[in-house]
Structure formats: structure tokens, C-alpha cells
Amino acid sequence: AVITDSNSGITQKQAERYGVVVVPMPFLIAGETYFEDVTLTHDAFFARLQEDVDISTSQPSPETVMEIWDKALETSEEIVYIPMSSGLSGSCQTAIMLADDYDGKVQVVNNQRISVTQKQSVLDALTLADRGWSAKQIKEKLEEEKLESSIYIMLDTLKYLKKGGRITPAVAALGTALRLKPVLQIQGEKLDAFTVAKTSKRGISKMLDAMQDDIEKRFGGIENVHMEVAHTCN
């Protein structure tokens, strides 16, 4: 069985089509807990975000993860579990500790992925499983290639970087006053500032330049690259 979490961007409906299981990530909104794409739709989440209510994320409880694993093992001999990057959440390390009690039947992949790159790892795992690879072999292959990806993100506001403690209030205030669009980068386990732009058009241009540089210098040409686009409410 291949299992991931909702940070992959795989919806519950897509999971049924792919034949995988998606662990929903919990959100705490105004003191109440919701589960992504189960008790909280994406549209509803972004609507609440616009209301300026307090929103924080959490990792799935150990009980939830183990319950999903146990159910999967009723029909599968082993599991490949692909959580979000260990550099962005403690959920991966928690899963690694939980897997110690499963005698090798659960292989937790720590390949520093999230969003579209995490989704691609799930699809790659399915392909390898269809070829007869064991869960351990799949884990090793995915981790071997963990640095062979890049994500570039442009945000419309600095507000949530400030709330998450990734930038200081002073920097956020200056950036907001200048109407700057932050461009972030994920390579490996960390989310880092890449550049800023004064307009969305300029931000997109800078991302495209960075992607072109990656394609030519890191990945050896477009024929070696798989690209995806992710967006929210636009």
C-alpha cells in the first residue's frame, strides 16, 4: 500500500482513483479542529483565511496514523508511507518512530518533498510497486533522489510569513509598504527566501529565470525534467 498526507495536494477523490490513502492534515481554526478535505474543503479554508481568524496547523496524531496503517495492513503486506518533508514538520520523524513497532512492514520515506513534488513521489512509488519493487526498495530509491527537485513559490502577501515567524514584523511592514511579492524556494528540507518582486508579473519572470537555470545547470536539460504548476484560489 502507498500512503501519503494531504500536503501532497492529492484529494480524497484523487486518492481513490490512484489507489492510495491520504492522511488528512489537521487545522486549528478559531479554536476548533478541522481535517483537510474531510471536514474542511479547500474553498472553505481560503474563505476563513480571508476572515483573518487565527489559523494554525498541526501534525496528524500518532493514533490516527497507526489506525490508517493498521487498516491498510489488513489487505497489504507492507506500506510505503510518504509524509511531508521532515524539514517543514515533525510528522515525518513521528512516523519514523511509530514505524519501529511494525517490524519493517512500514517504510517511511524521508525525501524532503511537499506539494507537487510529494505527489510525484507517490506516483513514482505506485509505478515502482507495479514493477514488483518491495517497500524497502521504493523507500531507498525515493530517498536517493530526494535532492533532485525544486519548488518556487510566489506569495501575494507577507502576512503569513510574519505569523509563522519566518520574517520579522519590521521586515513584513516594510515589504507590505513597498507592496513586495516574496518568492520562496524549496530545495531539500528547508523553505528559504529566494527573491522579492514589485509586481506579480515580475515575480513570475524571476521564477521562470530560476527554473531555466535549474533545468540547464542542475538537471541537464528539459528532457530530464517533469514540471507541475500549483495554485490557490486564482
Where are these predicted regions, by residue range?
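N-terminal glycine-rich anion-binding loop in soluble enzyme alpha/beta folds
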Residues: A1-Q59, T64
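Long, low-complexity, intrinsically disordered polar/charged segments
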Residues: A1-V2, L73, M227
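Mixed-charge interfacial surface used for oligomerization/domain docking
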Residues: N7-V21, P26, E78, G87-Q107, ...
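A generic structural signal for short
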Residues: Y34, T57, P83-M84, K159-L161
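Generic signature of intrinsically disordered, low-complexity segments enriched in small/polar residues
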Residues: D37, R48-L49, A72, K105, ...
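A short glycine/small-residue-enriched secondary-structure motif
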Residues: L40-F46, W69, I96-D101
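Glycine-rich phosphate- or other oxyanion-binding loops that anchor nucleotides, phosphorylated ligands
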Residues: E51-G87, Q93-T94, K139, K146
